[in-house]
Amino acid sequence: MYVDPMNNNEIRKLSITAKTETTPDNVGQDIPVNAHSVHEECSSNTPVEINGRNSGKLKEEASAGICLVKKPMLQYRDTSGKYSLSDFQILRTLGTGSFGRVHLIRSNHNGRFYALKTLKKHTIVKLKQVEHTNDERRMLSIVSHPFIIRMWGTFQDSQQVFMVMDYIEGGELFSLLRKSQRFPNPVAKFYAAEVCLALEYLHSKDIIYRDLKPENILLDKNGHIKITDFGFAKYVPDVTYTLCGTPDYIAPEVVSTKPYNKSVDWWSFGVLIYEMLAGYTPFYNSNTMKTYENILNAELKFPPFFHPDAQDLLKKLITRDLSERLGNLQNGSEDVKNHPWFNEVIWEKLLARYIETPYEPPIQQGQGDTSQFDRYPEEEFNYGIQGEDPYMDLMKEF
């Protein structure tokens, strides 16, 4: 069923219980989905306006994430040189940013649609994002989960690096949230539950995501989520000191430059739930530095329409006391999943995608439909140039 996202009353008032079908759509299959905007990176603490939202990011100000205890490293899948530009047709631009673009492409071999993320090497080096770029490739080469984007391969020329990703037709959760203004409690709960399972999976592999927000959550053709943009994701078995993220969502321990662990994702998870329910984040201020002050010191307040269980969960996620933050305690993500707000969620069914979604994107053209993405001016691209590459040693894995 399709619904009008402009009308909250028409979003399905779902109870998060199982579908009646014996098998869910696309389970066990590779779903051809997902593209996302290349978000701007800040060269200072000044926020950048993207899609009408203050979504500036902080650059890395420490050299590398520091792990205090050595653990066996993850096994990365080799993705380099798996494809070349000649394997695809570039159809249109899906998103732009200071690093490059995301294009809708079509394979010349199997006819399927993909998203091609292009990043300019010169800009990556200039903005000191080499480590983040390499980490993004590494983390995406590890993960495999129903609610996380899939990267199929990478390649490069002398000026760009390229990542071939799933194309997700349904667009950003951010767009749906802005059209809806805010989500009813059951709808926010559905998306939060799927995000919770994705975070649980990442943390089981000692991966911190560090940039959870509606812009980085895509909806597939059936309305299930796909977390994308792993530009700040990192393998951290213990703690790290890297300063990065999106201001409204950054945990206080990151703002105060203290060592931190996976608990920062659970803080951001709480902020995400709050924004879905309220339509705004709890500590927002048009002045970014004031936002940071609010994160460190302001009282967490709730609109009167928040369900009591939602308030209780958010108090236990958006807490500065790490010894009380859900997800960071002895039982990890189980404490979050067992909270009363999630009582009716059947987690096994949700993971298997048996649960009916509250919203199905109005995709009319099938695979390759771009109606849920903004239009961008198309330019002449100098892709595929071979020649002297001063940055080859910095991005060998592409």
Swiss-Prot record:
Binding site for ATP: 94-102, 117
One Gene Ontology CC term in the entry: cAMP-dependent protein kinase complex
Regulation: Activated by cAMP.
Any GO molecular function: protein serine kinase activity
EC number: 2.7.11.11
Gene Ontology BP term (one): G1 to G0 transition
Keywords, sorted A to Z: ATP-binding, cAMP, Kinase, Nucleotide-binding, Phosphoprotein, Serine/threonine-protein kinase, Transferase
Location of the Protein kinase domain: 88-342
Active-site positions on this chain: 211 (proton acceptor)
SMART domains reported in the protein's UniProt record: S_TKc
Family assignment from sequence similarity: Belongs to the protein kinase superfamily. AGC Ser/Thr protein kinase family. cAMP subfamily.
Miscellaneous note of the record: Present with 1590 molecules/cell in log phase SD medium.
Descriptive protein name: cAMP-dependent protein kinase type 3
Gene name of the record: TPK3
